Structures are given as structure tokens and as C-alpha cells.
Amino acid sequence: MFQEKSEKSSFPKRSSSLRSPSDSPAITSKNVFMFVNYSKDWPLILVGILLMGGSAIATLMNTYIYGEIMGKLSQFYLQDQSNHSFSQDIVKLCVGLIGIGCCKMILVWLGMFTWLKFGEIQQSRARMQIYNKIINESQSWYDSKQNLIGQLTQINRCIEELRSCNGEILASLMQTIVLILALLIMSFYQSWSTTLIIMASFPIMALCGWYFGKLTYKAQQDENEVTSKASKVFNWCYVNPEMVRFFNSKNIELTKFKQLIEKSAQFYYKLSHAVAANTAVLKTLTLMMFVQGFWFGNYLLSHKTITINQLFTCFSSCLMLGQAVSGITELLAILNTGHAAADKISGFLLQPPSKAKLLLLHSKYPPFEIGSIYFKNVWFESNSQNSVAILQDVSFGILQNQFNYVIGKSGSGKSTIAKLLMRLYSVSRGTIEIDTVSIDKLDPKYICQNITLLEQNPVIFDDKTIAENIAIAIVDDYDSLQAIPYYLIEQSAHFALLSDLDLNMKVNHLTLSGGQQQRISIARAYLKNSPVLIMDESFSALDTETKQGLIEKVKKWRIGKTTIFITHEYKNILDDENVIILDQGMIKNQGQFKKMKNEEIVQNYKSQGIETSSYETTSQSFSDNTKLPDGDYNYKTNPYILKDLESQIKEDTDNEKLMGVLAILRYCSSTINGKSLLGFGILLAIFQGVSSPVFSYCFSKLLSTSLDSSIGLNSTQKILQWSCISLSIAIFTGVTSYLSEFILNYCGENWIVSLRQLTFFKLNNQDLSFFTGFDTNWSSSEITALLMNDTRDLRNLISQFFPLLANLVSMTLIGIIWSIVSGWKLALVGISFVPLVLLVTVLYGKILESIENKYKCKVNNVELDLYRTITTIRTIKIFNIQQYFETVFKEDLKVLNSIGVYRALQTGIGFAISDLFSSIGQAIILFYGMKLISQFQYNYSQLLQVITLLSFTISNASILIHQLPEITRGQRAGTFIVKLLKDITSTMEVNDSCGVSSVRKRNSKSGSDSIGTIGPVKDNQLFKKVTTDNDTLAISFNNVSFSYPNKLPYILQLKSISLDVKKFTTIGIVGQSGSGKSTILKILFRLYDIKISPDSNTTKKYHDQTVKIFNQNLYLINSGLLCQTIAIVPQFPKFFSGTIYDNLTYGINNTNSAGSNSSSSVSDSEIIKILKLVNLHQFIVSLPQGLLTIMNDSDNDNDNGNENENENENGNTISTSSSTSFTFSGGQLQLLAIARALLRNPKILLLDECTSNLDPITTKIIINVIKSLHGKLTILFVTHDKELMRIADNLIVMKDGQIVEQGDFQQLISNDGEFTKITKTII
């Protein structure tokens, strides 16, 4: 924990250097070697080459010994060697085989470990460079990114592919290259003419490898690009679930997501076709080499120009050479996917830096604190080709050591002043001078240490406690968060009226109100205590009493220090304090406040008496006197217990037991489409597996003909016969290889497409409690990576596990049975190795399950660090805490590297053991077979047949180990997908054209139940039409009680509410914080189900509660019809990165909804009419792009990366550029939100604090809009605005979840009740 009672000065300050030196080289290429630092990596590369090269030489020595054994056999039959001498020589040669196998195992193990470690190093450098770019880029760079989260989700996958290519793929490539060179030398030495004949097909192999590799590279690039777009859509819906529900855009997003992943699948099918065709051609050509090699070899034997030893050695070398060439082309095809991944990474890293970042290279750090601040002829324009001036020739001074106020209506440029002063953006023209030095020449660290900006919507770090969220403001001054004296944090918390400092935000951050978050932000500022403080609407979410108290405390604290207030409230401005008035980006007036009182904006404020505060929205307050009732205590809210729970969750995740492959496939069986096609693919894989022992039988016959030739027998007829059979089998193997591989890859991709669609659909149909509950363990980055990246590994369960299993079973059974029939004595010796191989494979698989899961969990931690940095980047820059976040990232990366080294050790041994088993098995089989020959129990034809069958069987069984890492990664992905699907509640909302045909109970413990499917909802009641003609009541609540599900502690927000709202009336809801006002609006929009309750007793007690819209049950109305009936304007409206037009019409043109109006679209004239109504038409027309102007994500002050495709409702891409984006003010966004709601032509309009945080002029516009709508539709608003209360037909006063008063404004104000108490605090 934090250190107690220590002096701040006793702790050393960190170095002022933000960046630590990196061993990563500059990016000069776009291939898998782009992060290799040869000056540092050469020892590792050299050792890796020597080890894998040594293992290749060991393979060559095996080939030589095989040739010697065949030579000894030929001499024995020619009676050139005695029985005793023959047996002794065979023993020596077989012992040599075992010795070479042991050496090769050690070399492969160490070599694989070396290259896997090398791959981990490249991965670390890639992640570090990505992180350095992210944390060093300017805010304008972030604003220009249209798909940052989607891009980085895909880049994370590309980094893993880069690691794999620099690890096991490069190891196999080095081994294969050395093996090819050695085999060429060996084969040419034995018989150059035979070698040339056998190598005749090599040019064709090389040409096929080049052509199909080119296709693979292009298809992989396209798949990566489209997948990143799909990731963006998914992330938007997961981070902004309420937006998707407000505007009935579930089908729009689902359709868009389906189109993208189906397009991605098409590219994968092309990739699979290229890889399968390449593999098939190479397999066919390699097998054909047998025919041409033996034909020519037998010719040489018959003419006595070559010995049997030379022929076998040459032929074995060429055979292995052909397999090596085939293998290297397959490796190069995989390497091409790595090059495509590297191209994606380099494309991101090589993006040009912003102008602001380039200026940092020449900045300086003055030795004194900030004094005078002057803006001189400052212009700031939007980041667009047809730029819009946000500030125009602005010149003013900030009075040093005094209080300064920047006021003006929304969109006048007030917040831009603060962002320019913090160097989040650079001025377009003019200068900002601090003590006569241009701000562009000052080090950003100097700016951040001397100036603190508190924004209206502060960021709360959800992985930290309240204390850590406060302490992070000065973490740069200490070695760590824990080194900060705790009493300093307590003092800051006390200043900001905060308690419960150990409360864990991982569980509770979603329950914080805006006011509570702002108090944490104020505590940070107090702790930092910088010379200059900028407060940008930093009190706007506080209730009046708390706000007034904190303002007084801040002004007392800041006496004698430069303080800048950006505000819409003027009652706390003293007559002699400095005020700057902005209007349309220009200075309208500046001077003492007493000289400004005749300004229009000040007069508007005085005449309306507006108080634009927004009360805190939850009953939990962190003020010192706040206590939970004893009866509501829940042990899960204890901060220390929560820490234990969090660590336990993390530990459980790391040690998650993986499901079996068959268990995963059984659970997900409903999503596996085309089972007949899958069965056909498996059957083809079995045929391919059967072809191997059949070909090995033909191979034994060809060997026999060679021995016949070596002892002088005529074998021309046999050679012709078995050569033709071998050619037929080679072609059959190639055809079945292509068809089985492509079909199974197709089925695997088709499966994950279905899984992605189903998961997206089910997540999109959860109520809001799934996304905001305390037991929601899925972060946005984690679930996006799982669904979009890890499912690529999941398809291995079909594309690799099934053919592997089919091949293993078919080859093993047929090989064993055939060998027993051919010669049971020798066969039984060979068969004894098969159980051992399978046992070791199973044990190795279990070990891999554990290490792969731990490794992937650490990868997720590193990716989560990157995601957190992106989503909180502005706060990180404002408080200059980049070094802290970089340290956290490096520590997690270090942990990942250590797990990666351990994983490399365990993975490497799998490759090594298979070679050892093959060598020992073949040596013992050869020894015992030769013994049977020497005892004349077997003839050489029978011997070769059994040895060949057993050798193929044992070798192929050993290869299973090589496939285990990929299958294990697929197992992990499948386990977590199943876990996600089980976590998704079955309380599905009624969707438009989609429903769930089978659902499960919440928290079902059965692992074998159906996961549901996407299909039509059959209950016609769900499509009930909303009619309003004969109903006088628009809204009716009957005995409604409600508690937010999955939130701690369980407290009823509504208690037996009964409420009737007549048609065409305007109703206001008022009350203190936590009284349940906004909860009513959320229930009306069906964001939560009132039937869901934390315990069954509560559910039974309130089973008769109902909510009706125009006398129809709210929960039986189709969501499309509901969104046509009700529109909502939230307190903090959100917009995606798209055009103004797309944002205004988002969800309107959703014509796929069952029961919805197919003609529900809006015309340009309707848009113009609504924009004029909300007083925005003239402003939007003044923009260079008009309605096609792109809105920045930063417009929302939203750091969650909620981006969306720039496509219209028909899925057509709108041609836009990030250079045409524009940033809107809070007031403009609020007016756009009202316009967006009115364009839906609703019958009921809900407004939640629609005038909070706005200037008097914008507030007046909104009030006039509401007045103009009176009598045309039913309006229900939540407010603390006195002027807005006056225009309501009826006011509903709430307290502690109950309605305590009703009536119009004048009636309630004269009753001296709860309403009077509320209005007194406002007035």
C-alpha cells in the first residue's frame, strides 16, 4: 500500500526523460525481419542456425546409415559377408541411428528454444514500438484516426503471427535450408546423374511455391484489413450498448458486421485455396520423384555403374530433398502471411507524425515556474482541407496569480483555449507566449507540471482504487504509486469531500455519478497543486450545495495562484475579477466583470436566473457523512475483500482449465453448418491417410526391385508395374489432399463466422445490466480480441484436428494391420512404440494446455495496457504520466517474455521428442528385421514391406506432437468462447427480424445446453402494433419496483411507483440525487427488465408490476416499434466518427424490422426543418462540407474508442477523409441530439438533463424548442433547471425512489414540501 506519514521531499524525483532507450531498430522494411537488431541479435541467430543446422546434418547422417544398412543386406544376399559379421555390422549401425537420434533431439530442442526466444524478442520490440507511437502521438493525430481500435485489434493479431514466423517457422526454415544443402552435396557425391534426374521437378515446385505464395500474401492482407473493420463495428456496439438500443440499430450493426466477416471469410477461402493447392501439387510432385528416381537408378544398377549402397543413399537423399523442397515452399507460404502481418504493422508505425509531435524535438524546459500567459493573434482551424476557424485572431492575457474567467455560449471556442494552452493541439497561426517564450518551444513536461486542466468529464482508471486514482496525478514525482505518502492523498480526498479511498474501481466504477468523478478530479488537482489551474466546467455535475462549498474551498486554496475558470455560471464571479468573453471564436470583450454586466450573455443569465447544474445520479455519495444502511451491507462491497476477489479472478483466469476439443465441438454443434460437407472432408482426409500406407507398400516393392537388380535379377516388368501404380497413388494423394484441406478449412472458417455472428447477436440483445454489472468480467479489448483474433485459432479444431485425427487413426490402423499380415513378428515390435508415442503426446498436450493458457493471459494483459492507454490518452498527457503507464506496460511485457521463455522450453521439447521416437523406433525395427533376415525367417521383400509400413506409421504418429501447439491454442479460444456464451444471459431483448429460438436460464450450470441460434421470433404478440388513437394515457407505471441487476449493493431505485402520463402533455421529473429520476427513463426505453431482480423473493413480490405505453405492455412491443414510438436525448449524447447526416439518421432507415414501417426514412427537407427548429441550420450550412462534415470521436469527450463505419444505412461507404473532421461544442452536440431524436418523429420524447452544463443562450434555445413541441407529442424530462420546470404541465417530485409530490410549478412551490426544499437550493 501507500507509504504512511512521509514527507514528499524525501522521495527522489524521476528523471525528466520521458523515453527510455530502445534496442528496436528503425523501421526500414516491411517484412518479418523488420524488428531484428543484427548488432544485438547476431549471437542468438548464429546459435540458432548452428543448432538447427546440426539437426539437419544429423538427418543426413541417418540417410547415410540407411544406405549402409541396405548395402550390408545386399552383400549378405550375395554371400559376400558372413552371418555373424552381418549381425555385428547391423548392431553398430542401429546403435549409431539411436545415438544420432539422441543428438538430434538435443539439437532440435535447444534450436527450437533459441528461435522461439528470438521470436519473443521480436514480438516485444513490435509491441514496444507500437506503444511508443501510441503514447507519443499528439491529440490531433488521435482525432484523425477513423478506426484506431479496430486497427490495433488486428495489429495485435499480426504481432502474434510475426512472433510465430520469427520463431518456429524460421527455425524450421533454417533447418530445411541446411538440410537441402547437405542433401544436395550427399546425393551429388553418391550419384550426380540420378540426382539430376530426380531434381527435374524442382523448378516446377519452386514456381508453384512462388505463385501460390503471392496469392497467399494478397489474401492475408485483405483478410487482415476487413477483419480490422469488423473489429471496429463490434467494439462500437460493445462499448456503446445504450446507443445501439436508443436508435434501434441492432440490425444495422448486425448486418454490417455480418457483411464484413463474410467478406473476410471470402478472402480466407482464397488463402485456403492457395495453401491447399500448393500443398497438393508439392505432395504429388514429391511422390512422383520415387518413380523417376527408381526407374533411372535401376537402369544404372543393371549396367553396374552404381552400387546398391550409392543408389539407396542417393535416392534417400533425393527423396528427403524433395520433401525438404516441398516443406520449404509450404514454410515460405506461411512466411508470406507473416510478411502480410509485418506490412500491416509497418503501415501503422510509418504513418507520418503530427506537426505537434515534430515540434517536441526542439522544445526546452525553463528552470522557473509559469508566470504571464498571453494569446497573440491566435487562430485555430479544424483539421480539414476546407478548414473552419474555431478561434479567429484571438488576443488576450491571463492575469498572473489571479482568478480568470472564460465565458461565452456553446461553440464559441472556450474549451479550445484550454486545450491549446495544454499543447493538446497546436495553433494554426499566431502565438501563445508564457513569460515571453512561445509555447511551441516549451517542453510538454514543463507545461504539464506547471498547468493542470480539469475537464468536464474526467477519466477514472477502472483498474485502480479511489486513492490510486487521486495519487496518479503526482506519480511522476515518485518511484511508484505506492511510494506516495498516504496522508497527502487523505488530505486531497478530504478537500474534495471523498471517503472510501480503498474502494476498488474495477467493481464499482460504473456506479460512480458524474459528480463523484468530478470530485476525484478536483482531489487530483489539489494534490498536484500546480502554479496554473484550468477548470473547464469542473463543477457542472455536482449538486448546488456541494458545488458551492467546493467552489469556495477552491477559491480559498488558489488565492495568489493563477486560476482559469471556463464556465456558464456567473454568480461566483466577483466584480473585480478578470473575464474574457468569447463569441463565435473571437474576443468580444475582456476586463473586470463589473464592466461586462451589460453583455447579452450575462443579461440572459440574470434574466432567467438559470442554474445549470446536474445533480449526482446515484444514492451512493463519497462524502464523509455518507453511510450505507446496516440492512444494505454486503460483504462484496468491502474494499479489502474486493481486492482478494479481483486477485482470485485473475488467478482463476490464468489457471482456467481448458475444455476438451470434442466437448467444445459438442457445445457449439448448432453453429457448425454444412455437417455433410464436413463429413465429406473428413472422409477425404481418411482417404489421404490410407494412401500413405498404400504408397509405402508400393515403395517397398520398388525397393525390392532395386535389390533384385543389385543381385543380377531382371526387374524391368516389376518396375513398370509398380511405377504406374505409384504414379496413380501420387495423383490420388494430391487430389484428396487439396480437396480435404480446402473443404475442412472452408468448414472451419464457416464455423467461426457463425460463432462470431451468434456471439455478436446475443451480446447485442442483452439488457444493459450485462455491460454495467459488477460481475461483468469481459473488457472491450479482451472480448474483441477473443472474437476477432483468437477465433482464427479456433478454426484449427476443424481444419487441423479432424484431418489429423482421421489421418492418425486410418494410417495407424491400416499400417499396423497390413504390417501384421505381412510379418507379424516384426510388426509387433514396431507396434509396441505406438502406445508410447500416444501416451507422450497426451502428456505433452496437457502441459501445453497450461502454458498456452498462461501465455495467452499475459498477452491479454499487455494488450489491455495498450487499450487503456488509448482510451485515457488525454488524461495521461494532461497529467504527464506517460512514464508511469509505459513502466506498467514494460513490466507486463517483461512478465510476458518470462512466460514466453518457459513456453519456448516446453514447446521445443515436443518437436524434439518426435525425432527421438522415430530414430529409436526405426533403429530397433531395422535391427530386429535384419536379425530375422539373418535367421532366414524373412525374405528381403517381406522385410522391406514391413519396415516401410512401420516406419511410415511411427513417423506420422510422431508428427501429431508438432500439431499440438496450434490445436491447444484453438482449445483455449474455444474454452473462452464457450465461457462467454455461458456468461451471456438468456434474458434477450425482442429484436426486429431476429430472435433466439432457444435460450437458457440465467447462470445456467449445464455445460451441454444449446447455445441458441439466430432465427425468427415466432410469438406474434411480440410484434404488437402501437396505436394511440383511442388512448388518453401515453405512459402508465403500475406498482413498479426496480433494483439495478448485477450491481453492488442491491438497493431498490424505485419503490412501488405508480404513474400516469396523459397524451400530448409535458411532464417534468425532479428530485435530489439518487431519487430514481433517470431510472424511470431507462425503464421506459427498456434498457432494463423490471422482472429481473437480485433475488427470487423480490421477483415474486412484484410480479404484478407493469409498464404500459399507450395501454400496451412495454415488454411485448417490438423494439423497432418502440424506437419509433419513443426517442430519448441523454444527458451526455454520443456520436460516432461519421458524417453529421449519418449521425442524425442513424437507425432511422432500418427497414428490416418486423412490424416496422418500411418507409421510415427522412428527406432532406425534414432534416432542414428540424435543424432550423433547433437553431443549427445556419451553422451547419456554414461548414465547408455541410451535412457531410465528419464528426470527431473527441466531440463526445469519449475515450472508449467508440468508432463506427462511415457507411450509410444501405452499407455503402461514404467517401470521407479524416482530414475533413470537425469538433463540436457541448451545446452544439446537445442540440444535434435533440434534432436526432425529433427526426424519428416520436410520439413520446424523453429528455435527461438536456440543459445541464450549457450556456444561457443555448439553454434558452432548448426551452423554446420544448415549448414549440407542446401539445404535439408527449414530453417527459428530468431536470434541475428552474426555468424548464416552469413550462411543464405537471411536475413529479421524487425522493428515495418514491413519488412524494405532484402538481404544476406554482402549486408545488406554495406547498412548502420536498419541491420547495429542492428549488430553494437552486434559487
Curated annotation (Swiss-Prot):
GO terms for cellular component: mitochondrial inner membrane. It is found in: Membrane. The keyword Translocase applies. PROSITE patterns: ABC_TM1F, ABC_TRANSPORTER_1, ABC_TRANSPORTER_2. It catalyses: an [alpha-factor](in) + ATP + H2O = an [alpha-factor](out) + ADP + phosphate + H(+). Belongs to the ABC transporter superfamily. Alpha-factor sex pheromone exporter (TC 3.A.1.206) family. This is Alpha-factor-transporting ATPase.
